Structure formats: structure tokens, C-alpha cells
Amino acid sequence: MNLMKKYLHSKWTSIEKLNGWRHYEVRNVFINNKELEIFSICDKKNTFRVKITDINDNSKWLPGWEEIV
């Protein structure tokens, strides 16, 4: 499957708050490095890279925007 299509603009919820936020969207896919550039929906300046293996780890990330209480 084309990684660009699978991950680009996908939405994710972080189990733990990162820089104060949980809800992120994929802005860029770096296929060679197997990394995603994600940004916080509430603070678009809050961006960083995440390994694709980490984003698929359900103990760290959930697909979509989920409410975590």
C-alpha cells in the first residue's frame, strides 16, 4: 500500500499529552526515514516527527480523534 495515501492527513490521538495536546494530524510522510511529520490541531506550530512504528503502537497512539478521560 502506498504509505503517502495511507498516512497523509490521517488523524491521531496521543495516549499521553505531547506539548499539552492530544489530537494530531499528519502533515508530511518521509518514506525513506519511515517517519511522519504531525501537528497539533489546536496549535499548528506544534509539529514534530514520529516513527511509523510508534504511531502504530496502540499504547502510544490511537487512530482518529478519541476522547481520553
PLM regions: where:
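Short coil-to-beta transition motif at edge beta-strands of beta-rich domains
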Residues: 2-17
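Exposed beta-strand and adjacent loop surfaces of beta-rich binding modules
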Residues: 9, 23, 35
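Short coil-to-beta-strand transition motifs
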Residues: 15-25
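Basic/aromatic-rich interaction segments and small domains that mediate binding to polyanionic partners
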Residues: 27-48
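Intrinsically disordered, low-complexity, charged/polar segments
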Residues: 43-69
